[in-house]
Amino acid sequence: MKKLAATLLCVLAFAACTNNQPDNNQNNQTNTNMENTAKVYLTRNISPEALVNIYKALGVEAKGRVAVKISTGEGSNPNYLKPELIKDLVHEVDGTIVECNTAYGNGPGDEKDERNNSAVHWEVIRRHGFTDYFPVDIMDEYDEIRIPVKDQRHIKYDIVGGHIANYDFMIALNHFKGHPMGGYGGALKNLSIGCASSNGKAYIHSSGKMEKLDMAKLWTPEYIGDQDGFLESMAAAAQAVTNYFQKRQGIIYINVMNNMSIDCDCVDHPAPVKLEDYGILASTDPVALDQACVDIINNQEVTATNDPTDLLSRIDKQHGTHTIEHAEAIGLGTRKYTIVSID
């Protein structure tokens, strides 16, 4: 996606025309009104044990057949959540790692790193070590299904991997970082683009204009020129996945703030990381969770080893917080939150 990412930034720029820490003894929230606030749990420790601890702090048991949705990472991307980090949590819930194929290719010479069909995706999954620890399921390997969407201003349904029907509960285990198109990637991105099949990704990225993936046409202004439409489509699709699992056994959300490049794990050769690792946050509200992470980045100070400037610039350039704002507007969650430290 190296060449594609550079092209997309040009297209979307046209279309879109400290380490300060939360005080663990006080509430850190977007609004002083204590009503209708979500709890966001925080640990500054990033470790296998910390992931289990923050899962338990939520007080929601993962029941039945548990899907753990991650990004397996493009082949040469070094920043994805490593299996060694997440293994204790996945084993704790007897979970299956779930993913879907992508909707883009990489530049010449990087074809081995692609994940746009199951054959090459499985090679990357094995190379990144996931099959050494867990059962893994590419949910759109064989089929896809449509699930209902509440907010239909852009997309009329969400096209997701067909194997989603095999699971009762989802843990959205998200790597928080930048994203070339969304500005940032967190819970809302992993729920929407992450759970969508290749065709579903095209449908969301094009704001409902393309239902059958055509990579030669998708990444052109005709299909991805509506930046806010794309962000609103992501929010709608995230709500669809959340509603799907809430009608089953449930869903929870965990954001890991480490290796925070301005580029997503879908970028084969991401920009260097300029931010220090921060911690792990978790919530039963994906909107509050992403808002808390963005606020943490906003509150970072520039030091010799920590510089949020590029990530904040990318979020602003791509209008990234609009996804959070729209998700709140359509009733997916609230941007008001209270930080609860578990350290």
Task: Show the residue positions of the predicted features.
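Bacterial lipoprotein signal-peptidase II cleavage site
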Residues: 18-25
